[in-house]
Amino acid sequence: MERIKELRNLMSQSRTRGILTKTTVDHMAIIKKYTSGRQEKNPSLRMKWMMAMKYPITADKRITEMVPERNEQGQTLWSKMSDAGSDRVMVSPLAVTWWNRNGQVTNTVHYPKVYKTYFDKVERLKHGTFGPVHFRNQVKIRRRVDINPGHADLSAKEAKDVIMEVVFPNEVGARILTSESQLTITKEKKEELRDCKISPLMVAYMLERELVRKTRFLPVAGGTSSIYIEVLHLTQGTCWEQMYTPGGEVRNDDVDQSLIIAARNIVRRAAVSADPLASLLEMCHSQQIGGTRMVDILRQNPTEEQAVDICKAAMGLRISSSFSFGGFTFKRTSGSSIKREEEVLTGNLQTLKIRVHEGYEEFTMVGKRATAILRKATRRLVQLIVSGRDEQSIAEAIIVAMVFSQEDCMIKAVRGDLNFVNRANQRLNPMHQLLRHFQKDAKVLFQNWGIEHIDSVMGMVGVLPDMTPSTEMSMRGIRVSKMGVDEYSSTERVVVSIDRFLRVRDQRGNVLLSPEEVSETQGTERLTITYSSSMMWEINGPESVLVNTYQWIIRNWETVKIQWSQNPAMLYNKMEFEPFQSLVPKAIRGQYSGFVRTLFQQMRDVLGTFDTTQIIKLLPFAAAPPKQSRMQFSSLTVNVRGSGMRILVRGNSPVFNYNKTTKRLTILGKDAGTLIEDPDESTSGVESAVLRGFLILGKEDRRYGPALSINELSNLAKGEKANVLIGQGDVVLVMKRKRDSSILTDSQTATKRIRMAIN
């Protein structure tokens, strides 16, 4: 107070004011401090000081033609003195006010296009719903979140090329637009921004917001998709939260969500096929999400989720170095260990071979609904500090940590045999056996763990075996905390390898991920996932397998037909028939296959018995490894709609129905496409059909020249003879009939004569 009085006193003397306004500041250190570098050292002071001047703004000379010298109140809007050091005009803030009221209005058509992200945000907020505010302790944990809704997923480099091409097309510099998305966006934006008068720099900034994913490491409790993050400041404080329902979705969140679902489906499906890695790659390459190739999305999208990371590893992309166990992401924060195989006995005296981690290590564990800090030594849990949304989530984290610790009391708590299998019916590895066992029922585990007295520590409570909190006692080494554990913040990615069973390892050989870690949660994708791979037909159940298998045969009929006659073994091994096998009762698969293959062989041997519909109908059954038996079948069973349904070997059935008149095939009542039979096949065998109007004279006769194809026969004159190539590469001598009347009888006699001629 005293100093202020003193200063006021000084300022009231005219001499002080004179000294302060006229004396030069010539202390070099001060001048250096405030003038070196372009960075403003005291922005708020600078702003206040500038705004106190009469003309704090400079503008281009053109302003003198666009803004009057004085406004209606007679105040000067710009100075006739030009700005020192440039040929610009010094302008008063009042000129801005005048312009806002009276300045010319430009064409606004480009504003919503350039500032699209802002306009969209306003719409989302307008249609969003804010609910009540609740006061409660917020367990926030820092997670890496997307803060920029509505963006494409281009890399910074790709985006830079697009922006340069759109905004500064005439600038020098090599720009290579390669990816599908780059080309589409460039074309779209050039179109939208034609004749745009908004400053190019501003357009470039706004384009960057639209094209690139921006992430921040922020404390979050609740939704992490970008449309929730944009209102984070409105929905959660230190001790309160406000309910909010967004007023619209954005494509980037939809892509992230659909990518996770697609990746999970693929990994689950690949795990049960003969060569999981090859199948997984085939599916990733043939699948589209919302019209974009899945492999392109995987290359650009930084989503970290177990299934997504397995797909990335298979494609040779780098992934995060953290590993996954029991649905939690583990990141080692200190310590180290060596691995050693050890045999242990369960409470049921079953021997398990486990890889023991020897050494002291600390980990953070981050799951969807709980997080923890784990300190462990060799086969011993030293301390576990958990926080989670509810009792259930906390219990899940405790079970995972107890199993991960490999403590003896955990292994001894096993009751009964461990024989869990994966989707491919293979036994799980011992650690996952233990995990599954205790996830089903952890009562014995918690009871046997042991209890200790605890000291009261701020923000921490004990937890008893029945999951009730306590301030006196707790399960040994385990505490529940009010504070969450932050997710691992680094975006560092490491090179990994993947084996054919989809186990992902880092360069030291530690397993980071395996199909067992992929969540079984089912969800509905927000963007259409197009599975063009036959492996994914069963995603939508048995009916889909049936329809897709037959549709595939019809679509590829030309190639299938040739393979059927020339290389059946290769045809039977096609992966497109693999899903179908799951519909055929296991016990009889081999017999069906043997029966159908024999039938097909007879068709090949006996001319004139080729039957398109029947081949298509029975072909999928021939794909199973055949068992030779003398059994004959008049119908074959497939398991669809919860029961066995019959496909008739000869004739139509509800499962497979071919309408000769309309040429349409219906499978289970659903249209499966048009089936074009070979010409005239319907009335008789293919050979006799094409030999109508010809008389078969006998075996090939070289005097009549090289064998013609059936199509070349039409050029023969009546009574002319020729050798003809028929059916399975056999050649016979024919003569074109002189009369048309007897054509009908040819069909019957041709078949007999061909056989005689060949034999």
Swiss-Prot record:
Q: Name one GO molecular function term.
A: RNA-directed RNA polymerase activity
Write out the residue ranges of the motif Nuclear localization signal: 736-739
Q: Where is this site: Mammalian adaptation?
A: K627
Give the UniProt record's GO annotations in the biological process aspect.
7-methylguanosine mRNA capping; cap snatching; DNA-templated transcription; symbiont-mediated suppression of host cytoplasmic pattern recognition receptor signaling pathway via inhibition of MAVS activity; symbiont-mediated suppression of host gene expression; symbiont-mediated suppression of host mRNA transcription via inhibition of RNA polymerase II activity; viral RNA genome replication
Q: Which Gene3D superfamilies match?
A: Polymerase Basic Protein 2, C-terminal domain
Subcellular localization is given as:
Virion; Host nucleus; Host mitochondrion
Which InterPro entries does this chain map to? Flu_PB2_2nd, Flu_PB2_6th, Flu_PB2_C, Flu_PB2_CAP-bd, Flu_PB2_middle, Flu_PB2_N, INV_PB2, PB2_helical
> What keywords appear on the UniProt entry?
Cap snatching, Eukaryotic host gene expression shutoff by virus, Eukaryotic host transcription shutoff by virus, Host gene expression shutoff by virus, Host mitochondrion, Host nucleus, Host-virus interaction, Inhibition of host innate immune response by virus, Inhibition of host MAVS by virus, Inhibition of host RLR pathway by virus, Inhibition of host RNA polymerase II by virus, mRNA capping, mRNA processing, Viral immunoevasion, Viral transcription, Virion
The record's annotation in Pfam families points to: Flu_PB2_1st (PF20947), Flu_PB2_2nd (PF20948), Flu_PB2_3rd (PF20949), Flu_PB2_4th (PF20950), Flu_PB2_5th (PF00604), Flu_PB2_6th (PF20951), Flu_PB2_7th (PF20952)
* Cellular component, GO annotation: host cell mitochondrion; host cell nucleus; virion component
The leader peptide range reads none
| Self-association and partners | Influenza RNA polymerase is composed of three subunits: PB1, PB2 and PA. Interacts (via N-terminus) with PB1 (via C-terminus). Interacts with nucleoprotein NP (via N-terminus). Interacts (via N-terminus) with host MAVS (via N-terminus); this interaction inhibits host innate immune response.
The protein's matches in HAMAP family, at most eight in alphabetical order, are given as: INV_PB2 (MF_04062)
UniProt lists the family membership as follows: Belongs to the influenza viruses PB2 family.
According to its UniProt entry, what is the function of this protein? Plays an essential role in transcription initiation and cap-stealing mechanism, in which cellular capped pre-mRNAs are used to generate primers for viral transcription. Recognizes and binds the 7-methylguanosine-containing cap of the target pre-RNA which is subsequently cleaved after 10-13 nucleotides by the viral protein PA. Plays a role in the initiation of the viral genome replication and modulates the activity of the ribonucleoprotein (RNP) complex.
Kindly provide the name given to this protein in its UniProt entry: Polymerase basic protein 2
Q: What is the lineage of its organism?
A: Viruses, Riboviria, Orthornavirae, Negarnaviricota, Polyploviricotina
